[in-house]
Amino acid sequence: MIDLLIIAGPTAVGKTDISIKLAEKLNGEIISADSMQIYKYMDIGSAKITKDEMKGIPHHLIDVVEPHEEFNVSSFKALAEESIKDIWNRGKLPIIAGGTGLYINSLIYNYDFTDADRDEKYREYLTKLAEDKGKEYVHSLLKDIDEESYEKLYPNDLKRVVRALEVYKITGKSISEYTKENEKKLYDIPYNVNYFILNMNREVLYERINKRVDIMMGKGLIEEVKKLESMGYTPDMQSMKGIGYKEVLFYLNGDISLDEAIYLIKKGSRNYAKRQLTWFRKDKRSIWIDKDKYNSEEEIVDKIIKMVKDK
């Protein structure tokens, strides 16, 4: 059975540094579980790790697709499983590091995407239907077959509306029902999982998030978004809806001021961290590491290593 170490937690909690230190001590390689860092050219807004910051540790699933390309949890699972096997077969430890809980769950709950993978013709039909009759009409199709998705999704979120309709067409189940069934496969995985969640005092975390946004602005987030626009990437693309990118686009479009954009990025990032923590708390397999209780990252790393070896 493959040993799999997972380091997760909210944005800006310090997953990168901890995972690199662990990789150095455990002869590991890192697989990113971040839904924004998979996109090429989107470096500043995603807080993407630099080559220098990697400290020679190989990183996987970073800069995987172009910003206009489709990438979802099914794509992540397939690529992550390949990387895990490759790393393990070379005698190294695969370490998953990131904050996208759905990506992590797809591995440790062994989500099965074979039944409801793709129906390109149906997707094309729905997309054309949205053009002809409007997004509201396509959204209304959910009402009788998947009321939960109908209530939760907005008509403008066409990608997810189409996905929910697609899953129902292929499986006859709502997307939430399908996901819950997958989650029942809790232990049906080929991994010996050691799953750690990093956390810290909420006020300190929010301060770190605010500071990170200021650093992003100083590094040239506005210029990065301008460059992406010049390359033909548009606000309707999933990648450009990410926190930081959508707000800067609003600013560049004249809808809000720069100060408002910065405020919204900070607020959106803090709310995202809150949602991440809520998600991670639902998982009973994870061990929580309160960073405030340790004097240094080295202490945290040593504690994690000890718990892994004592398991």
UniProtKB/Swiss-Prot annotation:
State the protein's purpose.
Answer: Catalyzes the transfer of a dimethylallyl group onto the adenine at position 37 in tRNAs that read codons beginning with uridine, leading to the formation of N6-(dimethylallyl)adenosine (i(6)A).
Subunit-level organization = Monomer.
Source organism per UniProt: Clostridium botulinum (strain Langeland / NCTC 10281 / Type F)
Name the residues that bind substrate.
11-16
- What GO biological process terms are annotated to this protein in UniProt? tRNA modification
- Sites binding ATP sit at 9-16
Q: Which family does it belong to?
A: Belongs to the IPP transferase family.
Q: Where is this region: Interaction with substrate tRNA?
A: 34-37
Name it. tRNA dimethylallyltransferase
Q: Which Pfam families match?
A: IPPT
- One GO MF term attached to the UniProt entry: tRNA dimethylallyltransferase activity
Catalytic function, reaction form: adenosine(37) in tRNA + dimethylallyl diphosphate = N(6)-dimethylallyladenosine(37) in tRNA + diphosphate
Task: Give the cofactors, semicolon-separated.
Answer: Mg(2+)
Swiss-Prot/TrEMBL keywords:
ATP-binding, Magnesium, Nucleotide-binding, Transferase, tRNA processing
